[in-house]
Amino acid sequence: MSMATGVEPTIDVKVFVDKERGKVLFAESGKEFVDVLFGFLTLPLGTVVRLLGGQSQVGCLDELYRSVEGLSTDLFRIEACKAMLLRPINAAAKQCCQLTVRVDDTKHREVYVCADTSCSVTAFSSVTGAVCNCGRIMTQLAGERPENPPNAAASGACEDGAFVKGGMKFIVTDDLNVAPASTSLMLSLLDKFQVPDPSCLEQMTLQFSSVKIIDLLRRSLTSQNPLTGHYLDVAPDDSVVDMLPEYLHPEEQDNEAEHSLVNASLRVLQTKNNSKVLYAEVGGDFVDLLFGLLTIPLGSIVKTYGKSASKGCLDNLYTSIAGSAHGCLRPECQNLLLSPMLAPYFGYGASKMLQVEELAPDKLDINACFKCFKSRGFANHYLCHVEPWCNYQKRYVKICYEKGKTTKLCELDPKTPEGGCEEAAYVKQGPQKFIVTDDLHVLPLSLASTLQVVIEAKLQRKDLVEKEVALTKPQVMELLRAALVTHRALSTVLLPAKINKKLHYHSFCLY
């Protein structure tokens, strides 16, 4: 909501509707709406699931998210690991904070330090529950670090938006192709949609609040016509086949060593007739691989898998950046959207497999001693330099007697207990085993959990067989992709390809 008026901001978008066909053909908007659309590409998958209330209907993501929620914190390396997966930080949060309508409320500028004032470790974490090098939990919130440098767009010093340049109108098609408005584009659209008389189109102005933006996000993930679905308030189209397309990366020619993944060996319980995988018995490293999906931005998924990344039309939005909307983005935002990154230290598992890079860890220069900063935070650390007049002593008296009045803080890895330098996983590595069901729900391995899966499948012992599977890199890539488009990820990838894997897509390109 607007701090000044208390009224939630909205964005006006004019849609052009073909009433006879019951379809929104395209929409016209300013930079505000296009900024929000491009902002979708920066959202981590875990944030998407959370914003959609765990009902995203995007493959197995809802089950993965529920698995993290349900697992005991004892199974993670430290408590912070669970929080990082449930509320991953957006690496482009600085830009997203400038959006007219914001949907992601994740705190990205919070600074946590060790609460022990005697601790001299000059480090901070962006995530609560991290472990200081001294071994204590970093629970002391120092406040939010200021943006440096302050953004001109946020202060109104220029007309540009969060991602796109200002001063122009944009056309957005029903399947989220974006381009600057022009006469040639108008004529092209009328021809494409076979509209001989433009007066037949009905023009409506829609107001998009945060709730409606979230609804549009949901539809963009599952529909080729999100604007029409939103305008007519129709249920998402479920006609798209819930299976993988043909093999994803036939062009890859990895050598044999690269095909063999360390510790990617599964014990699979499946039906003898190869109709279904019930679950896989796995170690913590495989669980980390899956959980890592929740930290990856939508744009990185589209960059890797293209049209096969989802049943929706975010691929059109992505290709517009370097295609029909080329030249419309602020120069510093072009690569940020084409190759979205992870927040510092959020990378592991799936992000390494998909080669998604991390931002460099942040560093803070504090104009105060460390003790004053710890106890007073950003709001009052200036008192470190204050010498108020003391009537009793008839002189100016220092509040702080520390000699060093400046502090340099380095961001530490929240996943690494006690400041270890090795790359840290989210899940504890050790003898603990897990089961991963066909829809990628993760549970600690136990007799009760395995029997429950078999009972729910309504299968007899004679129908079941256990197999050992060693996954190759291409299979892991397929599995991660399957997690985004089907509720039967394990069956789709591990069983013989006798099931129809064809996906049907309907897309309209501007040029």
Residue map of PLM features:
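Long, position-biased, composition-driven segments near the start of the mature protein
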Residues: 1-511
